[in-house]
Amino acid sequence: MNTIWIAVGALALLGLVFGAILGYASRRFAVEDDPVVEKIDAILPQSQCGQCGYPGCRPYAEAVGLQGEKINRCAPGGEAVMLKIAELLNVEPQPCDGEEQQAAPVRMLAVIDENNCIGCTKCIQACPVDAIVGATRAMHTVMSDLCTGCNLCVDPCPTHCIELRPVNETPDSWKWDLNTIPVRIIPVEQHA
């Protein structure tokens, strides 16, 4: 019975010693993050789509905060994200498409040819916003409300049954921006 208590005590002592060493090391070798980069990263939509030319939202936030990259390259975030970053950095807002002369980008939507889909789930694994639903060896489909048109699901498909199609702007497909219409709350007087 004493050997069990000795073993338990030895393990507890080892846990305390290694915990203290890890605690000291985490404080001693801590890397300070730039608070501006953290704020920019919090503003970005975290879709990790790569449309900005960076592998994810965090590298793009670091490029904007530390290297002075353009603030208008986040396609899923659009103008709202660009304006928030411009306000945070106290810089002039830039056109969302990067150049004044270019036409506004057409919203694209991934469409799966369900007759040719073999249910391999490679597109589901590639989608950064979970816009594709389906199960193994079953038909997959794209939820159009969630799809950002990032093109990351097209290449992994072994049967090439996914294509990007432009979305026709109709009242049903339009993404309404609630900030475009100024809303004012009017106080109501209650009469007894």
Swiss-Prot record:
EC id: 7.-.-.-
Single biological process term from Gene Ontology: electron transport chain
Localization: Cell inner membrane
List of residues binding [4Fe-4S] cluster 3: 127, 147, 150, 153
Residues that coordinate or bind [4Fe-4S] cluster 2: 117, 120, 123, 157
Cofactor note: Binds 3 [4Fe-4S] clusters.
Gene Ontology, cellular component aspect: plasma membrane
4Fe-4S domain mapped to chain residues: 32-91
Molecular function in Gene Ontology: 4 iron, 4 sulfur cluster binding; electron transfer activity; metal ion binding
Record keywords, A-Z: 4Fe-4S, Cell inner membrane, Cell membrane, Electron transport, Iron, Iron-sulfur, Membrane, Metal-binding, Repeat, Translocase, Transport
Gene3D superfamilies in the record: 3.30.70.20, Electron transport complex subunit B, putative Fe-S cluster
Cofactor(s) in the UniProt record: [4Fe-4S] cluster
Every 4Fe-4S ferredoxin-type domain range: 108-137, 138-167
Role of this protein: Part of a membrane-bound complex that couples electron transfer with translocation of ions across the membrane. Required to maintain the reduced state of SoxR.
Subunit field text: The complex is composed of six subunits: RsxA, RsxB, RsxC, RsxD, RsxE and RsxG.
Family in the record: Belongs to the 4Fe4S bacterial-type ferredoxin family. RnfB subfamily.
Stated name of the protein: Ion-translocating oxidoreductase complex subunit B
